Design a protein with these regions (language model features):
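Extracellular/lumen-exposed scaffold segments
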Residues: 15-141
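Hydrophobic h-region of N-terminal signal peptides that target proteins for export
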Residues: 5-18
């Protein structure tokens, strides 16, 4: 019985392959213009790897952590499922997020957070949830 259990474990371990993980299919990019001290805005947009699509439901979520020196108007953002160009459950135009920030002091900041989304590979018939650690760079002048 033990030999059978060990055999099953070995077979399953080989199926996953060494270092097997999901591909990162959506890469965030950030507006690079400096923000004036006071109030400003950072735009977060996304590039999707060829061959993959991003689900409209559940929504794309961007959850940010508060940091010293910056006030974030919103720390939990979710995309709208509406996409007028879409005829199925996937985005044609992946939405962007506008992040309103306030800072009294100039300097370099990094806003840490998590990006959560669901993607599919239509060719493989495979869908999955992905969680990505992000650091949004921000220069306040």
């Amino acid at each position: 019985m033990v030999n059978v259990a060990v055999g099953i474990i070995l077979v399953l371990a080989q199926l996953s392959g060494p270092g097997a993980s999901l591909p990162q299919v959506m890469e965030p990019s950030y507006s690079t213009e400096a923000v004036a001290a006071g109030r400003g805005e950072v735009t977060v947009s996304f590039d999707v790897k060829k061959g993959y699509v991003i689900n409209r439901v559940p929504s794309i979520q961007l959850k940010l952590d508060a940091i010293d020196g910056l006030t974030l108007r919103e720390t939990n953002m979710a995309s709208s499922p509406d996409d007028p160009k879409s005829t199925d459950e996937y985005y044609v135009d992946v939405p962007t997020f506008s992040l309103a920030v306030e800072s009294a002091e100039s300097g370099q900041y990094e806003i840490p957070g998590k990006l959560v989304y669901f993607f599919c590979s239509k060719a493989d018939g495979f869908c999955s949830r992905q969680v990505l650690d992000v650091k949004i760079p921000l220069t306040v002048e």
